[in-house]
Amino acid sequence: MTISSDLILKGSILIREIEKTFLDLFSKGKLNGTVHTCIGQEYIGALLPKIINYDDVVFSNHRGHGHYIGKTDDVEGLLLEVMGSESGAVGGVGGSQHLYNKKGFFSNGILTGMSAVAAGYAFAIKNEKKIVTYFLGDGGLGEGILYEALNLISK
């Protein structure tokens, strides 16, 4: 597989600019709820479409904007969602952290909150030619559910 560094750089810059826009809108009180950006982690989201297939599934965390863009390429849906618009990715009710896309993207604002769901999904499709990707941060490593999920999928 050849991965174009130019495309990854462009994707990283796009994600960074979107995140900066969210921070600006948040500071002006134009967003409902909170916003957790992935600034400093943009490369991961930009690289994602190069390392997974269309049918693969992504479970993300509270800093999942870059993952969302990388998996779905739905920049407009993300922007509208975080701004609370009914035209957003999940009708304006999910906000920054609770995102979904029928292309196979799920996120949750609770640290390691998707670990058991991702493990169950992976178990359910274990005979298919798909990959389940799960993103977590180090802050979730103290949560018991993560280790239970890892035990389930290690069998």
Regions found by a protein language model. Give the residues of each.
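Cofactor-/ligand-binding subdomain signature composed of acidic, glycine-rich
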Residues: M1-N32, Y54
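Cofactor-binding active-site loop characterized by glycine-rich and histidine/acidic residues
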Residues: K20-L23, K30-K155
